[in-house]
Amino acid sequence: MNQTGKLFGVGVGPGDPELMTLKAVRLIRECDIVFVPGKVPEETVAYQIAVQAVPEICGKKLVGIHMPMTKNQELLRKSHEEAVATTAGYLEAGCNCVFLTLGDPCIYSTYIYVHKQLSKQGYRTEIVSGIPSFLAVSAKLNEGLVEGAQMLHVIPATYQVEEGMDLPGTKVFMKSGKALGKVKAAIQKADLDGKMIERCGMPGEQIYNSVEQFPDEAGYYSLVIAKEKEGM
């Protein structure tokens, strides 16, 4: 019996293809199958980042993995099961596979659901880190994220804005787009400094250096950093 293939969850970073790791590039070149989160692989952001760093990906077999953006737990469960079954089929055939994900696979990633199930089933899996969006945003703003004994909190803006504002230290609000009005109001109420980048490292990048500049709504790839004002 042939040995099953191995699955690599590969972070392609936040948007700038030059921020992809050497390991990510090598694995994409060497793999048999590339899984991409989306119905049409070539149209996904993850693929569009990767193809700039690894043009050879065009010659790979691409498999779209559809995972809907929904809070409906039944729909999510079904999509996860389908993704696991699809991925396992290629692993059983002995294919070494890469599953692309934006940023880092460990942070709010669609990949991690597949990873956990396949690992439990005994398949060989490996997570390959990528640069997370909040680190890229902090670097693009040309400033540090935390210093000394400051705490760092990463918060999904679509769920827990109010609870997050009560936490001490620097607050990162991910996926802020549709919740931006709520995030903006919460930052102003708490009298914090807020900055945001939309589409960091991608075409159409927009930088907002103060909370007053924030629109009431932005695109999906919008990330907000809120800090205590200097001198407080």
Where on the chain are the PLM-derived regions?
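Class I S-adenosyl-L-methionine
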Residues: 1-17, 22-24, 29-123, 209-215, ...
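A contiguous loop/helix-start segment that scaffolds small-molecule binding in enzyme catalytic cores
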Residues: 7, 165-232
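Short beta->alpha connector loops
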Residues: 14-17, 40-41, 158-160, 175-179
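Structural signal for conserved beta-strand scaffold positions within catalytic alpha/beta enzyme cores
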Residues: 36, 61-66, 127, 147, ...
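Short gly/pro/ser/thr-enriched loop/turn and capping motifs at secondary-structure boundaries
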Residues: 41-43, 132-135, 202-204
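A short acidic, often aromatic-flanked loop/helix-cap motif at beta-alpha or helix-coil junctions
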Residues: 67-73, 160-162, 202-204
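Class I SAM-dependent methyltransferase SAM-binding "motif I" and its flanking Rossmann-like core
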Residues: 106-167, 215, 229-232
